[in-house]
């Protein structure tokens, strides 16, 4: 992505929250040392728990630092939170992280409502809005649109992004954001699509729309966009893909933009295969021109590598017992399917 002057010419965070039917008070397990400690329920609490049924001694969900998930996955939540903190420790600038793992139900959010210049990750929004527009008009993508979309996503071509941004129009782009529930996202004005203001919370909502059945994007649209995101040129496939194990497929869109304050480096992606099904978004403002583009990329990858390790280790550990758990509690499968429609609780993002 070039300088701002070039731009003028050119995902649901699932918080793992389960509705409680309890009429009684929530209880908390004792605290234990280490990353696998069970959070106490407290007014100040850095960790909270919610009872799944009235009088139940076992909380349904537990929050550990930045991450929330099922009680049985509290160690994973704690490990992910610790690894995110470690990855960002000592790094210059401002950062935001969001992730969701469908297999374990664990989600994490750091600085979720902070606004960042989108740079080229807005191209994923442009693509999704184009596909939604064709769903509404019941028309197929033209050969020209397919060519432009391919260049925009796989090569991050700015001219193609400008062409499609102009074709869709601001009204249709905003309509898509409204349908997606991406209320914190503010479209760039005067054609400056790369200055669209995005949040880690909303980027996860977008990734959610691309990876599970929903009323906004149909199966064809989801498959088409993910197919393009899986073909991003190797020179632009850095970021949240770092540490992806063999056998797991990635679908990514990155963005990079320098200005007087420093480099803006963003990376969003979804991952599937070998029972894996998760998504990660990392946004960053370096806020120091002494730090180059690679510094921002390194920051994102310092977060992505341990997160990839944690999630894939959890998938391998849990896959052998998943069938037995679902057979013993068939309502769990229903909960996983319907939970995708839940918009996570988050304070209204500050407008900036």
Model-derived segments and their meaning:
Residues 110-116, 189-192:
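A short glycine/serine-rich beta->alpha loop
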Residues 150-152, 180:
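Short helix- or helix-capping micro-motifs
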Residues 2-15, 25-28:
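Sec-dependent N-terminal signal peptides
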Residues 105, 115-139, 152, 280:
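Active-site SXXK
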Residues 132-150, 173, 221:
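Short, well-structured active-site flanking segments
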Residues 55, 59-95, 100-104, 164-352:
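Penicillin-recognizing serine hydrolase domain
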Residues 55-70, 106-111, 127-130, 154-158:
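Acidic/histidine-rich, surface-exposed loop or edge segments in extracytoplasmic proteins
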Residues 17-53, 72, 316, 322:
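C-terminal region of N-terminal signal peptides and the immediate post-cleavage residues
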């Amino acid at each position: 992505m070039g300088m701002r002057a070039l731009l003028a010419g050119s995902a649901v965070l699932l918080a793992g929250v389960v509705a409680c039917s309890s009429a009684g008070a929530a209880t908390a397990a004792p605290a234990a040392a280490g990353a696998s400690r069970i959070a106490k329920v407290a007014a100040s609490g850095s960790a909270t728990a919610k009872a799944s049924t009235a009088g139940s001694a076992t909380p349904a969900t537990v929050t550990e630092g930045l991450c929330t998930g099922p009680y049985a996955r509290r160690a994973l939540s704690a490990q992910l939170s610790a690894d995110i903190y470690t990855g960002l420790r000592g790094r210059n600038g401002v950062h935001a992280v969001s992730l969701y793992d469908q297999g374990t139900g664990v989600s994490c959010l750091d600085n979720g409502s902070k606004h960042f210049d989108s740079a080229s990750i807005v191209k994923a929004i442009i693509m999704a809005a184009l596909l939604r527009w064709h769903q509404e008009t019941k028309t197929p993508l033209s050969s020209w649109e397919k060519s432009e979309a391919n260049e925009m996503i796989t090569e991050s071509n700015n001219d193609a992004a400008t062409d499609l941004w102009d074709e869709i129009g601001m009204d249709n782009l905003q309509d898509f954001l409204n349908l997606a529930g991406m209320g914190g996202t503010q479209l760039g004005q005067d054609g400056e699509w790369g200055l669209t203001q995005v949040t880690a919370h909303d980027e996860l909502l977008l990734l959610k729309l691309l990876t599970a059945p929903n009323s906004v994007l149909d199966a064809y649209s989801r498959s088409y966009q993910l197919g393009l995101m899986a073909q991003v040129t190797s020179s632009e496939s850095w970021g949240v893909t770092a540490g992806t194990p063999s056998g797991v497929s990635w679908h990514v869109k990155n963005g990079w933009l320098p200005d007087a304050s420093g480099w803006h480096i963003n990376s969003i992606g979804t991952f599937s295969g070998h029972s894996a099904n998760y998504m990660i978004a990392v946004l960053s403002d370096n806020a120091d021109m002494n730090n180059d583009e690679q510094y921002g990329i390194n920051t994102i990858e310092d977060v992505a590598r341990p997160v990839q390790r944690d999630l894939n280790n959890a998938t391998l550990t849990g896959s052998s017992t998943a069938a037995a758990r679902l057979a013993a509690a068939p309502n769990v499968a229903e909960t996983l399917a319907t939970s995708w429609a839940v918009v996570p609780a988050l304070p209204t993002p500050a407008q900036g």
